[in-house]
């Protein structure tokens, strides 16, 4: 079974990852195939593993999580029909329920623009840019993010003191075996973290099997893409962090626990459903539905861990095409616009980077620029503590992990999972498609549900939105000529939502009295699409995270700041209060009431809220199911969702300040 799936996965991965840019450098079919390790022949557990669902423990560690029931039902509908348009919309707007990521992420990755047309900045280009750009760096090897990146690509970012001492050891003659040994060494660091840095540790047979799959997945990626990028420890960390949400062994629920979870026996694995058992138990039939997805499903998604890992890396490490190639395509398509392109380089960079994205060097510079503009006090404190001056492995490499590797290793798995949701759901609107096309793809989603998903996080004012523009002007007490603003084109390009007004018909299936009354009552509604490049959006998410930790950071010294940001704590995780028996009893009663009053994902609104006088008072679209253990505990609910929303506010604040400065 594993051999067949390996053959199928290698064929599909070679089909999906080929592109004109990359195939010229690497032809996946010419890469030597790696034999599956013997551990893969071990038969995975067939029955459901022991779960904490339904059991009550005074040491009940649960991540805070709540989710609108109507959006959940819509997500389930899209998942059952493999509707990647609908899943991408929900994923970028609200995030995916964490216990469904192992089925949703493969569907999103298969259709992701960065997977369909991949481009990863080759190491040679990085070295050329490294030698030519010496902006604000010292002459030491760790003086700039670029130099540190090259050393990390060669030696591994985590190669600190103990790693360099290991280098003099004799290396295997086989280059494949040499890479495998590096992967094993980086996997060992993860194990040491979770085994409390014990000098000697043992792993179970199940843990060994999972780690072997991760090792094999990283090795095969390097053999396929090794002519573009060399092995780097970040690849192993991406595999480890993916395994915290996607079970490496097919048809099992076992995932890595991550750093936020601790078990009495220091186990590396946990049941996928355990963390969210409170939420799962509050929705009838959801547990059986999830178990069917885990143990029986082969229709929705049967992508292997190796295939998902490869596609995830292509998304996280994606880089836009070099400027020279972009200019060649622009010459053929926009020759008239090139005459107007002789603008100041700084302004061109600021007005194009949010839409096109940039290299890691450009993103680091842009991050520092936005930090000074949006968080001046924190930026000044960082300057005093000499933060963001050196980017070597002992300095500010945390920023490289934040921006280039999208929070791999340094963020909590709960925060990182939600941010990866946002990035995997990123989709641009095809200008050749109209509203009716996408509305049909969304299966004519209810207008109220669409409004509940909200606008794109990084919405901005469109040039045709005169009312909003006038409101901005009045609030600032100024007027400006939009035609003279160098940000005019940027705003127009970013204003890409598909709107439908009461003057426009949707489709034959929507042209009825009920829908027409909806259109008459409200002038318009829209389908939100992504506006800002996801890696640029990640910069504002990172700034939002720093803003939320600002009060803590200003109390720390240089070393403490770097340690703190290299292992950023989460607020999405809350420990249950100790030994309160009445709290346990309250949870039992509230859980039973919620279970009887909630709707099944397949249920109807008429079954809602049987203990209330008027069921209309609590319709389906207002029910929020929570993962909290008891109602009187003060959980930090939706911390990362608030961070993402705040990042949109920071984006608009930056855009507005640039518009003012530009005048």
From Swiss-Prot:
Presence of keyword Cell division: no
GO cellular component: cytoplasm
Highest taxon in the source lineage: Eukaryota
Segments forming domain Rab-GAP TBC: 95-427
Sequence segments annotated as region (Disordered): 1-28, 126-178, 575-611
Keyword Cytoplasm annotated: yes
Family the entry assigns: Belongs to the OCA5 family.
Protein name: Oxidant-induced cell-cycle arrest protein 5
Organism name: Candida tropicalis (strain ATCC MYA-3404 / T1)
Gene from which the chain derives: OCA5
